[in-house]
Amino acid sequence: MGTTLEILHTGTVIVDRALPYHRPGDPPLSWTHAFRGRDDLIAVPVSTYLVENSHGLTLIDTGWHPVNRSRLGQMANLRHQYPVNKADLPEGRAIDEQLEERGIRPRDLDLLLMSHLHCDHA
């Protein structure tokens, strides 16, 4: 059996372009989006990875939690990160919804690997 990799996008994170692409000449603290316009906002995909090989089925990362669909949910879940990061998670794009579309139940996963532990999905 070979290895298959499927990239599953679980919405986007809306941030100031200075957060991922800080350039010389950007104002100090521009990554916070303080005193900057809507034109400085960008949407960055929040991705997970489904890997299937002879060792089984592995999910790498879990993406946005559905609680982040509401503003209050984001404020509670993202806490101090909320002013800098805004979640956009359309219906049907949460990881559990996408796995269900594929006929995969959480118990079918052999391994869940978290690449990092942010408050939004850890």
Spans of features found by a protein language model:
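Glycine-rich nucleotide phosphate-binding loop and flanking beta-alpha elements
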Residues: P66, D120-H121
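Well-ordered alpha/beta subsegment
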Residues: L99-I104
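Metallo-beta-lactamase
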Residues: M1-E97, D108-D120
